Amino acid sequence: MATGDLKRSLRKLEQVLRSLNYPNEVDYVGLMKGDTAASLPIISYSLTSYSPHVAELLMESNIELIAKNDVRFTDTVYKLLRDQFDYKPILTKKQFIQSGFAEWKIEIVCDILNCVMKKHKKLIGLDKNSSCQRKKSISEKPEPCSSREKCPAEAVGIDVTGRFMTSGKKKAVVIRHLYTEENVGVPEGTVTSTEVSEGCDELEEQSSDIRIPEAQAPEVKAELQDMCDNPELTALQIALAECQEKLKKLTWIEKRLECLEATTKGKVMVDEKAWNNILSRVTLLETEMLLSKKNESVEPNTTSEDSESVSGVDVVPYDKKYSVEGPASTCHSSGYSTVSSATVPRSSTINYCGLNNFSEETTMQKMERMKKMFEETAELLKCSSR
């Protein structure tokens, strides 16, 4: 590809963009490389933002060019060019999306911009013709006074075009006569029929800018008149609309509640403080259980040690008896031999029984405490479930 042809096509694109009043910056480097990302913004601006008439045409034909990727955008643009503009590009869709073909892509962009400008001029001409036809139809048909509006019994004049003209502003309307006398006997506060007709034409031109379909025009006028005549009804309609919006919000909230109920079905909701209290109680119970198990393992060892000590205590005095029988007979007068030997093991056995009773009482107290703790935790769980 010659660089001269590429520069010529870029100059042509610059001229078209000037006539189009393109506000954004143009990526000329991307256009020279044949990058599609450089040409797509220009095409989207020409079809969506340049002409409101072309945008309306796209809306009527249900064509959306916003929020689409490059492939879908090019697909819709090719369909639009085929259906609405009767234009077939030189490149195919795949070739246009691929990199390269810089000169051909610039030519296609220029052709699209020219087609859009031609379509814009054509649609403007159609709108002007339709507005002229409306003016003619309005001028041919006199506007009858509605039954609701009372026609004022003031000076009424008829214009050359056949309109009824009423003196709404306390200014007399003078009929234009055929003789050519220059303002003979016309007072200062009067207005000629030509001035009134010019004012009506200006008002019609302003109203033609607000586009209402011809079939819906009488309905819209009737609705506006009803709103002006009955402000209470309009207020009620506004209140109804607000109520409908609130009802929609309520239905949405109900759906959210149903979803929450479905997600929390079979689950127990517990307060954070209660849950922390339960956890602390459970940890206390676990520690007490561990301590009780340790105590139970320690108790049989102590009992075995006590039994061994008791057996030792019982055996020792009997040995003394058998070993010291000679001197015991000599000390019978004092009475210490038999009594002392019998009393020592009894006292040791009594002390051992007292220790066993004390250990049993402590274990029972621990079990009662554990029962109370379990009952309290069960009550807390019941309250939280309720």
From Swiss-Prot:
Location of the region described as Binds with microtubules and centrioles in the Swiss-Prot/TrEMBL record: 11-194
Chain positions found as Phosphoserine: 329
Coiled coil: 232-262, 359-382
A Gene Ontology term for the protein's cellular component: cytoplasm
Pfam families registered for this protein in UniProt: CEP44
Taxonomy, superkingdom: Eukaryota
MF annotations from Gene Ontology: microtubule binding
Primary site of residence: cytoplasm
InterPro entries: CEP44, CEP44_CC
Cell compartments where the protein resides: Cytoplasm, Cytoskeleton, Microtubule organizing center, Centrosome; Cytoplasm, Cytoskeleton, Microtubule organizing center, Centrosome, Centriole; Cytoplasm, Cytoskeleton, Spindle pole; Midbody
Record keywords, A-Z: Coiled coil, Cytoplasm, Cytoskeleton, Phosphoprotein
Keyword Transit peptide on entry: no
Biological process per Gene Ontology, one example term: centriole replication
Stated role: Centriole-enriched microtubule-binding protein involved in centriole biogenesis. In collaboration with CEP295 and POC1B, is required for the centriole-to-centrosome conversion by ensuring the formation of bona fide centriole wall. Functions as a linker component that maintains centrosome cohesion. Associates with CROCC and regulates its stability and localization to the centrosome.
Self-association and partners: Interacts with CROCC. Interacts with POC1B; the interaction is direct and recruits POC1B to centriolar microtubules. Binds to centriolar microtubules.
Name the record gives this protein: Centrosomal protein of 44 kDa
Source species of the chain: Rattus norvegicus
Source organism phylogeny: Eukaryota, Metazoa, Chordata, Craniata, Vertebrata
Gene (UniProt): Cep44
